[in-house]
Every structure is written in C-alpha cells, then in structure tokens.
Amino acid sequence: MAIKGPRKHLKRLAAPANWQLPRKVKTFTVRPSPGPHSMDKSLPLLLVVRDVLKYADNAREAKKIIQTGKILIDGLKRKEYKHPAGLMDVLSIPEMDETYLVLFDESGRISLKKTDKTDVKLCKIVNKTVVKGGNIQLNLHDGRNQIVKVSDAAKAEEDVYKTGDSVLISIPEQSIAGHVAFGEGKLAYITGGKHVGEFAKIVEVENRALYSDIVTLENKDGEKFKTVKPYVFIVGQDEPVISM
C-alpha cells in the first residue's frame, strides 16, 4: 500500500545517528518539520530543549517552554516544537543571557556550543542563479535566498559572490553584512567525513569537471588531509569571523 503524504512519525531507532538521543527509552521521537535544514543536519527544537540543554524533564515541559517564544533562532522567535535547529544556527535565550551555536562535535554528532552574543550568522553559498531583472540570487545552506542587486551580472566586479563562499547574515535583519571568499589559505570548518567538526586551513584545491572538487587542508597539528568541497565551510582567514 502506498504512503500518502509526508511521514508524521519517527522511530528513535530510525533517527539520524548524529542525534544525541537515547534509542531504547521509548519507541518514537519528534520528526522535525520540513524547513531550512535536512533531518541529518538538524535537531527539532523540542530535543534541543529537553535532551541537549536539559531545560525540561519531558516533552510536555519542553513544549511549554518553546511556546512562550523566549527561544530565538537567528534572532526570530520560534514557537513550533518541531522546528529544526541546524548547522550554524544561532540559538539565543535573551532572558537567560545565553547564546549557542549549532555545530558538529568531532564524532559528527549535532551539538550546541555556548558562545558570545552575536548579531551575525555564517551561511555557505551552495548555489546561485540570475533572476528576473538581472539580479543575482544566492541560495544558502540554511534554505534562505538572498537577492544581490547588480546592474550587470556578467561583470566580474559586480558578481563577487561564488559558490562555496560564505556570507555573514545580520541578526535579526537577515541581510548580508559580510563576505568570506573560498580559496587557498582560508580557514574552514569540516561538516562531514572523517574529519567532521575540525578546523583546518585550505592548502590546495583540485578542480574536477564531473565530480566534487577535492580540497587539501592542514589542521592545527600540521596533519594534512583531503575531503570534498561540499564538506568545507569557510569561516575566516586566520581565525573564525564569529566566536566558535
């Protein structure tokens, strides 16, 4: 019998391996709502409040906390307990003067890192297109689209944003506040593969026509390794442009 419509439930045993979630306590857990992040790169807000931050003992308490609107993601109130909090999202609780950044730990699990209060967020450009009117649309890793107004998209001096670059998005205005280009010598955060969760500098980029580019990086211990470009998230030059 065919499945009609999107799935509404998720068994704990079928949840992504990088969720910090006890598997055999109960049968089901929260399925994140469709949104800015894929399921394997995000956590539903309920799990963030109950299982990661430990602000609640059960789902009922966590829902009540979320519904107060006191938890912000990227400067916006989120009252839906299924809303996904994903990579590089800035989660803040102004009433408690706490700010967290959603990252991966070195085991690849989704985690929260307590950070300084920030008014910007890092986003990776995953694609870009020219839209009606000749302007450039940047498609970012968290599902948002940013329009860059230009007089002529074919001019290199106006088309400064490239796929793989990172941009700083202001909070809560949600507009572009800065730009960090992809390239050799830049500091990157690894979002997948064996070296997930590590910071490393780009040493070399091998361009390939039919497959993802191969990037050679060097970590703080001087170890060199290779990974594919989709796993490389540019965060700065010598230091991250935000507190990480």
From Swiss-Prot:
Domain S4 RNA-binding, residue spans: 43-106
Superkingdom of origin: Archaea
GO biological process: translation
Protein name: Small ribosomal subunit protein eS4
Cellular component terms (Gene Ontology): cytosolic small ribosomal subunit
Family: Belongs to the eukaryotic ribosomal protein eS4 family.
Any Pfam family: Ribosomal_S4e
Keywords on record: Ribonucleoprotein, Ribosomal protein, RNA-binding, rRNA-binding
Molecular function via GO: rRNA binding; structural constituent of ribosome
CDD domains: KOW_RPS4 (cd06087), S4 (cd00165)
